[in-house]
Amino acid sequence: MSTQSTHPPKPEAPRLPPAISSCQRRHTLPASEFRCLTPEDAVSAFEIEREAFISVLGVCPLYLDEIRHFLTLCPELSLGWFEEGCLVAFIIGSLWDKDRLMQESLTMHRPGGHIAHLHVLAVHCAFRQQGRGPILLWRYLHHLGSQPAVHRAALMCEDALVPFYERFGFHAMGPCAITVGSLSFTELHCSLQGHPFLRRNSGC
């Protein structure tokens, strides 16, 4: 639900849109920062996600209370990209303990699991078409690879997005058991053992 050489050209930094410029700029804030999200980031994440998904699918992968739920239980399975202290892109995941995703995995975090279920990847509308989604995904996979308990990453997406995720080492497992209303999805898995990101700097 969510492009790009290892060293993509750096586009001219866009002006922060009103929704983002509400975060006051301070010289002490890093121009660009990656970090795990906290429950305090939930509202900003939901605003980005709602704009990205509602107009296209009519639903959000996670709603505000679910975002807070996962950022409270497993913030280490999230990653946000911040510009001047404001969130511009993020991924939220949780652990799952079965071989395949199922309906319960949409809302559950299983601490004993070894599969990181990627619930959502979203980029603020003012920062799209800049290669940020792929960069963030590479960094997230590297982040997961540093966690010994996580052996695989799994996600579900529409068929049109399968080639995008295959570029990062994901493999289609067939139709996903999860449905959302009338929407159906393909399930993809990525082994974190021997993945190229372990031998390759993302160039960010």
From Swiss-Prot:
Inducers of expression: Exhibits night/day variations with a 10-fold increased protein levels and activity at night in the pineal gland and a 5-fold increase in the retina. In both tissues, the mRNA levels remain constant.
Matching Gene3D superfamilies: 3.40.630.30
N-acetyltransferase domain ranges (all copies): 32-193
Gene Ontology terms describing biological process: cellular response to cAMP; circadian rhythm; melatonin biosynthetic process; N-terminal protein amino acid acetylation; response to light stimulus
Keyword Transmembrane attached: no
Recorded GO MF terms: aralkylamine N-acetyltransferase activity
Main location (coarse class): cytoplasm
Catalyzed reactions: a 2-arylethylamine + acetyl-CoA = an N-acetyl-2-arylethylamine + CoA + H(+)
GO CC annotations on file: cytoplasm; perinuclear region of cytoplasm
Modification after translation (UniProt): cAMP-dependent phosphorylation regulates AANAT activity by promoting interaction with 14-3-3 proteins. Phosphorylation levels exhibit night/day variations, with an increase during nighttime.
Keyword Ligase recorded: no
Binding sites annotated in the UniProt record for acetyl-CoA: 121-123, 129-134, 165-167
UniProt tissue specificity: Highly expressed in pineal gland and in the photoreceptor outer segments in the retina. Expressed at about 100-fold lower levels in the pituitary gland and testis. Not detected in other tissues.
Residue list for modification Phosphothreonine: 28
EC number assigned by the record: 2.3.1.87
Broad enzyme group: transferase
Superkingdom of origin organism: Eukaryota
Subunit structure: Monomer. Interacts with several 14-3-3 proteins, including YWHAB, YWHAE, YWHAG and YWHAZ, preferentially when phosphorylated at Thr-28. Phosphorylation on Ser-202 also allows binding to YWHAZ, but with lower affinity. The interaction with YWHAZ considerably increases affinity for arylalkylamines and acetyl-CoA and protects the enzyme from dephosphorylation and proteasomal degradation. It may also prevent thiol-dependent inactivation.
Job of this protein: Controls the night/day rhythm of melatonin production in the pineal gland. Catalyzes the N-acetylation of serotonin into N-acetylserotonin, the penultimate step in the synthesis of melatonin.
Designated name of the protein: Serotonin N-acetyltransferase
Lineage: Eukaryota, Metazoa, Chordata, Craniata, Vertebrata
Gene name, Swiss-Prot/TrEMBL: AANAT
